[in-house]
Amino acid sequence: MKYTSTRGGLIGVDFEGVLFSGFAPDGGLFMPEDIPKVDKRTLQTWSSYSYIQLVKEICSLFISPESIPRADLEGLIDRAFIRFRHRDIVPITRLKSGLNVMEMWHGVTHAFKDLAMSCVGELLDYFLKRKNKHVTILVATSGDTGSSAIESVRRRENMDIIVLLPHGRCTKIQELQMTTVIEDNVHVFSVDGTSDELDYPIKRLFADSDFVKKHNIMSTNSVNWARILVQIAHFFYGYMQCAPLTELTPVEIIVPTGGAGNITAGCIAQAMGLPIHLVAVVNRNDIVHRTVQYGDFSLGDTKATLASAMDIQEPYNMERILWLLAGSEKSHIKEMMKEFQEKKRVKLPEQLHKKIAGAMTSCVVTDENILGTIGRCWEENHYLLCPHSAVAVYYHYQQMDSNDKSPRCCLAPASAAKFQDVIIKANLTPDIPQEIKDLEKKKTRSHHLTKEDDWEKVLRQTIESISQRKVQ
């Protein structure tokens, strides 16, 4: 299996090369040159597999044994999930009104980012130890990615991590999960900007290929292919749990969508032959919805919502989806993305718009809808939803109320315990685990950056300081 940039400037890259990259040198994102197909017999075999077994099978399709021998791959995947609190990793909770909720938040930080990030940490460690190398990881977060990335690499001598979080735009718990990790290899910056704005200095820095190479810089944001790869597995698992497999019945999988990394994994699962229909459910930051419905891929102002981790107006993983669906027209992606970067808007070609509208539907959910859904789910089931999970469940309730009884799986990306203010706003009482309560008592450490600061310059200085320390 080899990888290519979505903009065509680089082909034939192996898995290790992609793992240790951020954006490709031409500004694109890495994707597999070929998507492996899974036939009906394989699906039936996999139907009895655990989530971890599915991760192993799917990763082995995209990682050649020359890169990582199968036994080594299985061992590192087993290690990745040791700290998860539920033996099923992503259990499906079945509730009234035909509601199936995939709980993706049983990892260390109580968010679905732990699923892929724990594997990425082990994959990085595997290659770095073999080559006695060090990397510096750059991550921008809208809320959950930062803490998950930190947990995946903390105390690892061969990795340092720099995290940019949007000051005042995360929940208090999300911020504490990052700022209370006081380790020599963890560097947290609280920045006066939106999560989209935090991506800009990182993208500019990755464009400086000499600097990136000199300091061994990479990203574990969902620009990193390995994040997308691991996430493919939970679409297969959700399908197996919610469909009567003997009929290969299509299942609708409802995906709360911000940066579009998760739904990119869903599109790849679909391309592999999994009979699913995807629903991209967004908050008022609706660029993905406008793209699906109207072919209008245009930037809007980032709006603060109750589903704060989805407050993203520039979902860079849409480039992967467009490339995947473009078929023989892949060469046009480079020009489309160049136009988007320059004008902050692009109209999709008619054929490409038809393909994306065929692959998924979309829905916009307001804060009022979120609160109403949290309340309804509690009233019917005594089950608390986080605001992002409520975005998915809102769509399910809309379909149920219109008598659509199709098998459906709602992805629940985070625990309600991380969003106490929203639960209280819904006139309910949050249920808070002890480890989250304990965050309030811990010391914190972070560096504040204002609008007046040169963010890219600060990043460069921090990276140079890390490299200098490693030489000493």
Swiss-Prot record:
What is the required cofactor set for this protein? Answer: pyridoxal 5'-phosphate
Q: Which Pfam families match?
A: PALP, Thr_synth_N
Per the UniProt entry, the Enzyme Commission number(s) are: 4.2.3.-
The modified positions for N6-(pyridoxal phosphate)lysine read 113
Listed A to Z, the keywords are: Lyase, Pyridoxal phosphate
UniProt cross-references to SUPFAM superfamilies, sorted A to Z: Tryptophan synthase beta subunit-like PLP-dependent enzymes
Task: Enumerate the Gene Ontology biological process terms.
Answer: 2-oxobutyrate biosynthetic process; serine family amino acid catabolic process
Tell me a Gene Ontology molecular-function term this record carries. Answer: pyridoxal phosphate binding
Do you know which PANTHER family this protein is assigned to?
THREONINE SYNTHASE FAMILY MEMBER, THREONINE SYNTHASE-LIKE 2
Q: Which family does it belong to?
A: Belongs to the threonine synthase family.
What role is this protein assigned?
Acts as a catabolic phospho-lyase on both gamma- and beta-phosphorylated substrates. Degrades O-phospho-threonine (PThr) to alpha-ketobutyrate, ammonia and phosphate.
Query: What name goes with this protein?
Result: Threonine synthase-like 2
Origin species: Xenopus laevis
Q: Which gene encodes it?
A: thnsl2
